[in-house]
Amino acid sequence: MARNRSSRTKKRKKLNIDRGVVHIKSTFNNTIITLSDLDGNTILWASGGTVGYSGSKKSTPYAAQLAADKIAKEALKLGLTRVSIEVKGPGAGREAAIRTIQAAGLVVDSIKDITPIPHNGCRPRRRRRV
């Protein structure tokens, strides 16, 4: 007989932290936003795909805005008040995500751009011709 399986959701622990780090990785195809504690342990994450978009719509600033809003609301539920933001990548969703986190009521301590810049390393992709 087939067993009725419950959905695979974990019970979220109440965290006793008031500060965190929001990592925004913005690529040309998607924007991934991760909330971690000060040690770097992931608490929660969201992306353009998890908020319901697929394909080229994931890379839009609006998808990044929805993902950042989801992260900010969950962070406020968990009791976080202050965050520092680390941004990585050249994508379109960077500014929209930062503005949304600030507007949601989280106090932003610092904004750091940690985009890796090569000192003439690997050969880059070919230039797009549209």
From Swiss-Prot:
Keyword hit for Zinc-finger: no
Keyword entries, A-Z: Ribonucleoprotein, Ribosomal protein, RNA-binding, rRNA-binding
GO cellular component: ribonucleoprotein complex; ribosome
Single GO term (MF): rRNA binding
GO biological process, one term: translation
Keyword Cell cycle among UniProt keywords: no
Family matches, as InterPro entries: Ribosomal_uS11, Ribosomal_uS11_bac-type, Ribosomal_uS11_CS, Ribosomal_uS11_sf
SUPFAM superfamilies: Translational machinery components
Purpose of the protein: Located on the platform of the 30S subunit, it bridges several disparate RNA helices of the 16S rRNA. Forms part of the Shine-Dalgarno cleft in the 70S ribosome.
Subunit structure: Part of the 30S ribosomal subunit. Interacts with proteins S7 and S18. Binds to IF-3.
Family statement drawn from the similarity comment of this UniProt entry: Belongs to the universal ribosomal protein uS11 family.
Name of the protein described by the UniProt record: Small ribosomal subunit protein uS11
Source organism per UniProt: Kosmotoga olearia (strain ATCC BAA-1733 / DSM 21960 / TBF 19.5.1)
Gene name per UniProt: rpsK
